């Protein structure tokens, strides 16, 4: 139509109307098609306009679709491209006229909607019947469009931009959807002070991730709603700007800038009534910049920030502030820094107490106060890579979630009984097919047993359902209580004191009494645990870090008390070393060790082959059931001074900077481990300087500036300095090789004694048991006679070399012979292998049976 200048959305609506008419078999396009097409656009302006009139757009769209379905149908060649009928052309003319009246350069969809309502057709009648007359629709334009004119083909980005690209935090606070903020009064007061300035009233919250920067802004929103702010902030609206949704879908150059400008214009036109919050403030630097253009979000808001027309609260981490904001001095000077530090453990407990009720209602479980204290203390001690209160809140959340999952899934007793019943049912089916007397007798007994088990199962399931029902009833009552408290706060703000009195002195106390009674009843339940305890928190800590933080079970206590005997099964004749290591582990597990130092740090001295490395492996096996579960650093690889970089990671600017160090990365991934520095005397002396902090403070900073926690590791250094000398000579050798400050930081220097002939006999037993374990894979049984063991102990005894010659001897005397016999077929898989001494030929004889 000549002179008709539609926006992109209007063009799409016209095209959709054409398609609807064609698909329905209608000979022409009518206003009904136009109305159905306009209201089918989810992101158009017509829907918010119709909603502003108090009419439900979905209902009108369905009724318009019904009108289209009733229109006369035709058959013919022109159905693929129907024309507008007289009523539809009249709508388009009216729309063009109205656009001119409004000063619009393009006809937008809300103007087209008003034009449909102005006509004398069925679509207009439908709108009028619902109360959306031409005058009513036109009357709500200012509330939706503001004072903006349609000057582009896509005005939708400019209308209601704030509603689209932001979240109203004050509205969420009114609805009770924001968690309470405990403490942080000083930081909130500082933010309020900066916001109350005349110019540059833009605070930026800077702190580590998880310390509660966003929570401070949410706390401010709650205070604004409660009126607990200075006059300059009373009644203000606090919005959170979503830059992500603003950038998303901006296909053409300038589209993002258009959206941002529309948002900024709305904020400006509010004349200081809106405070804007941008989480991850550093994202404004570079957001929306294209090619060589310097026009990004940061540069667009600078003038507004300087003049005080935009009150902006930002939040970002220290690293990102330094990396993005500080580089732009003009942007940085417009912000006032508010540093948010990590709260202390005591403050974190207070924060958790404030959030406790929300988490209890969400998960439907009770949380003990001691569990909150445990969450703060254990997270502070063991989860060192994150910050309070975030990590403590996560612990409580996951512990409650774990408990809820256990409540919802069937208990172990029911599980076991169900398996027994299933097994008996299968057996019953099998026996019912048998005809012999024994089977029939067994079937009678089995059916009786099955009936008993089913009865037991039925009772347990009924009891479980009752307990679960009681717990769920408490949960529902708590949810209702939370809703009533929120209603009471809203009524108090609205001045409805009658409702406040009814809720606070009637329904809320009554419900609180019901909850208390129901909780007393659920305490008596035995099948289901519905209380988060310190042990539950400790289990979650153990799952996250691998550190056994919970109470020791009886079995573990006995295991720790008998630790020397357990380690002695692998390490023979070194009782002093075994006792020293066992004492260190027991101290740590019992909680009497210094929490700021490693569990234990030892220097093992002694000749080669006496069990220094073997003790480290035995300790790893004792603690983790796997002797390879340790960090082993072979110090002979660190003979050069520059090799220290491999332990902690290369410094910035060097190749491999982003890969981390061999020591620091391994301990960061597994903070509860055994670290073995083997053959330390082979390393360059400067390598030990980096271990000083580890031994004293239990921490080490890697090449990327991250602090790695060594407080839950056992550090073992092995060396054969002064081997063969007396104890004093060995200690003198240590003092010559290592600096005093290094030796002084070790828990103990343990000297390993050379092995005696008798001790070697025990080692023969251990080595043969290991060989038998390897042969078990081929179903071979190994039987070694006492004379053969004695022969091995005598021939393998070389005091200067320890137990290693014995291992070589077993390999040659038994392993080599056995390998040949297996390959030749003399010994087959599944055989029993006998090893005897052949004293005449000074060797061993292998036979199979």
Curated annotation (Swiss-Prot):
Q: Which residues form a coiled coil?
A: 393-525
Sites where the protein binds ATP 1: 207-214
Instruction: Give binding positions for ATP 2.
Output: 606-613
The record's region (Disordered) falls at 1-25
Instruction: Tell me the InterPro entries matching this sequence.
Output: AAA+_ATPase, ATPase_AAA_core, Chaperonin_ClpB, Clp_ATPase_C, Clp_N_dom_sf, Clp_R_dom, ClpA/B, ClpA/B_CS1
For this UniProt record, give its keywords in alphabetical order, as a comma-separated list: ATP-binding, Chaperone, Coiled coil, Cytoplasm, Nucleotide-binding, Repeat, Stress response
List the GO cellular component terms.
cytoplasm
Record flagged with keyword Hydrolase: no
The UniProt annotation puts the region (Linker) at 343-546
Report the principal subcellular site. Answer: cytoplasm
Q: What protein does this entry describe? A: Chaperone protein ClpB
The encoding gene: clpB
């Amino acid at each position: 139509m000549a002179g008709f200048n539609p926006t992109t959305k209007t063009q799409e609506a016209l095209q959709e109307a054409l398609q609807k008419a064609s698909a329905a078999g209608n000979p022409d396009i009518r206003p009904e098609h136009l109305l159905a097409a306009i209201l089918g656009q989810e992101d158009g302006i017509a829907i918010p306009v119709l909603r502003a009139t108090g009419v439900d757009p979905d209902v009108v769209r369905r009724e318009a679709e019904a009108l289209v379905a009733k229109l006369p149908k035709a058959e013919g060649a022109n159905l693929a491209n129907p024309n507008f009928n007289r009523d539809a052309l009249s709508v388009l003319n009216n729309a063009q006229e109205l656009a001119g009246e409004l000063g619009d350069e393009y006809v937008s969809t809300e103007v087209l909607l008003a034009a449909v309502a102005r006509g004398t057709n069925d679509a207009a009648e439908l709108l009028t019947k619902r109360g959306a007359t031409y005058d009513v629709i036109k009357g709500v334009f200012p509330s939706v469009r503001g004072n903006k004119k349609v000057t582009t083909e896509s005005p939708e980005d400019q209308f209601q931009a704030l509603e689209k690209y932001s979240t109203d935090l004050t509205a969420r606070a009114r609805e009770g959807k924001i968690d309470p903020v405990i403490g942080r009064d000083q930081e909130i007061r500082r933010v309020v002070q900066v916001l109350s300035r005349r110019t540059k009233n833009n605070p930026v919250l800077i702190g580590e991730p998880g310390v509660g920067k966003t929570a401070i802004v949410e706390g401010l929103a709650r205070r604004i709603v409660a009126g607990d702010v200075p006059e300059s902030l009373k009644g203000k609206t606090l919005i959170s700007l979503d830059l992500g949704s603003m950038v998303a879908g901006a296909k053409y150059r300038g589209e993002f800038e258009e959206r941002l400008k529309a948002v900024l214009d709305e904020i400006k036109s509010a004349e200081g009534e809106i405070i804007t919050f941008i989480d991850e403030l550093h994202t404004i630097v570079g957001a929306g910049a294209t090619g060589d253009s310097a026009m990004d979000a940061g540069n667009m808001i600078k003038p507004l920030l300087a003049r005080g027309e935009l009150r902006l609260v930002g939040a970002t981490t220290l690293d990102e502030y330094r990396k993005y904001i500080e580089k732009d001095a003009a942007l940085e000077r417009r912000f006032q820094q508010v540093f948010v530090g990590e709260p202390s453990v005591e403050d974190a407990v207070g924060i958790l107490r404030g959030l406790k009720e929300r988490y209890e209602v969400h998960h439907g479980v009770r949380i003990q106060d001691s569990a909150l204290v445990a969450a703060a203390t254990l997270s502070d001690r063991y989860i060192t890579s994150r910050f309070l209160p975030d990590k403590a809140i996560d612990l409580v959340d996951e512990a409650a979630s774990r408990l809820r999952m256990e409540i919802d899934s069937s208990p172990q007793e029911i599980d076991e009984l169900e398996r027994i019943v299933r097994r008996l049912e299968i057996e019953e089916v099998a026996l019912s097919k048998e005809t012999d007397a024994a089977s029939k007798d067994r079937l009678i007994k089995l059916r009786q047993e099955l009936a008993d088990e089913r009865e037991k199962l039925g009772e347990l399931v009924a009891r479980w359902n009752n307990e679960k029902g009681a717990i769920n009833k408490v949960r529902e009552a708590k949810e209702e209580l939370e809703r009533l408290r929120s209603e009471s706060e809203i009524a108090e703000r609205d001045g409805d004191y009658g409702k406040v009195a009814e809720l606070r002195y009637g329904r809320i106390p009554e419900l609180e009494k019901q909850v208390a009674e129901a909780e007393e009843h659920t305490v008596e339940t035995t099948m289901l645990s519905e209380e988060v305890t310190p042990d539950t928190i400790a289990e979650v800590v153990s799952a996250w870090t691998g550190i056994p933080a919970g109470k020791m079970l009886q079995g573990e206590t006995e295991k720790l008390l008998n630790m020397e005997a357990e380690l002695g099964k692998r390490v023979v004749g070194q009782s002093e070393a075994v006792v020293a290591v066992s004492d260190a582990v027991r101290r740590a597990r019992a909680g009497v060790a210094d929490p700021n130092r490693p569990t234990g740090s030892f220097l093992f001295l002694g000749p080669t082959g006496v069990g220094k490395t073997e003790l480290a492996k035995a300790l790893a096996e004792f603690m983790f059931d796997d002797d390879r579960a340790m960090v082993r650093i072979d110090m002979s690889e660190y003979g050069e001074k520059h090799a220290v970089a491999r332990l902690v990671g290369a410094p910035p600017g060097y190749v491999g900077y982003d890969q981390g160090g061999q020591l620091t990365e391994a301990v960061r991934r597994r903070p509860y481990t055994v670290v073995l520095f083997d053959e330390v005397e082979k390393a360059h002396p400067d390598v030990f300087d980096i271990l000083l902090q580890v031994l004293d403070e239990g921490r080490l900073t890697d090449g990327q500036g991250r602090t790695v926690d060594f407080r839950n590791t056992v550090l073992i250094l092995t060396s054969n300095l002064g081997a063969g000398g007396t104890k004093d000579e060995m200690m003198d050798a240590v003092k010559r090789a290592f600096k005093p400050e290094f030796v002084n930081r070790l828990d103990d220097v343990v000297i390993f004694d050379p092995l005696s002939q008798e001790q070697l006999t025990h080692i023969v037993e251990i080595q043969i048991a290991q060989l038998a374990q390897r042969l078990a894979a081929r179903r071979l049984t190994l039987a070694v006679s006492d004379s053969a063991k004695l022969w091995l102990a005598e021939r393998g005894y070389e005091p200067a070399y320890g137990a290693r010659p014995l291992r070589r001897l077993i390999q040659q005397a038994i392993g080599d012979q056995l390998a040949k016999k297996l390959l030749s077929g003399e010994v087959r898989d599944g055989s029993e292998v006998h090893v005897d001494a052949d004293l005449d030929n000074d060797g061993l004889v292998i036979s199979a049976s």
